[in-house]
């Protein structure tokens, strides 16, 4: 991944007033790799006073999780509400020997964990229970952006108060659209077609 100018995002760049009205604060896991980014994340987490604001974390990459585990643990200690990850990232964060052990790790957590498994669909772990959602059967062209599309779509549905199974179903559908095109974004028409679902 190329972080570009975002690697220099620091606490001074944050609009804290806007954050007070935010429904979700979404933390991209790559932000642990930059001291400025990590400082900004901690500053925002410390400043959130609205108990309705959902704090969501993407684990981003298994190698990043392994290399910066202490920083991820520090973010977790602020009281995360949701974690998004793929199966490799889930195993890395849980420091588990296999996926089954990782599932048990997340069942004992207070936050919701949403795990994507590519063509095998996705799993939500919430309050000790598992909810499985099958993938949409398609022929992928390019998986770039699929995880971000999944997380964004899931959170969109969650804010609209969909049942968790429906959140996952919508996210699976949306991410199935992104992998059928080259690049990490849909056309404007593609996004509009999703909004009306």
Regions found by a protein language model. Name each.
Residues 24-103, 120-122:
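Conserved beta-alpha-beta core of the PfkB/ribokinase-like small-molecule kinase fold
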Residues 1-36:
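Conserved phosphate-binding/catalytic loop of the ribokinase/pfkB sugar-kinase fold
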Residues 2, 85, 135:
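Active-site donor-binding loop signature of nucleotide-sugar glycosyltransferases
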Residues 3, 87-88, 148:
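Alpha-helix N-cap/helix-start capping motif
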Residues 4-11, 62-67, 95-96, 133:
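Short gly/ser/thr-rich secondary-structure transition/capping motifs
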């Amino acid at each position: 991944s190329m972080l570009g100018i975002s690697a220099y995002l620091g606490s001074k760049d944050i609009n804290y007033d806007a954050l007070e009205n935010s429904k979700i604060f979404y933390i991209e896991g790559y932000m642990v790799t930059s001291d400025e980014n990590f400082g900004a994340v901690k500053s925002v987490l410390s400043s959130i006073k609205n108990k309705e604001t959902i704090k969501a974390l993407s684990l981003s990459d298994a190698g990043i999780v392994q290399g910066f585990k202490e920083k991820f643990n520090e973010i977790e200690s602020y009281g995360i509400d949701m974690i998004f990850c793929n199966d490799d990232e889930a195993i890395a964060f849980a420091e588990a020997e296999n996926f089954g052990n990782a599932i048990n790790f997340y069942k004992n957590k207070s936050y919701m964990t949403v795990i994507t498994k590519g063509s095998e669909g996705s799993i939500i772990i919430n309050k000790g229970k598992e909810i499985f959602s099958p993938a949409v059967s398609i022929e992928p062209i390019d998986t770039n952006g699929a995880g971000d599309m999944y997380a964004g779509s899931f959170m969109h549905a969650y804010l609209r108060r969909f049942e968790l199974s429906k959140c996952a179903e919508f996210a699976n559908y949306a991410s199935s659209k992104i992998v059928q095109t080259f690049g990490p974004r849909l056309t404007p028409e593609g996004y509009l077609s999703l909004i009306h679902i």
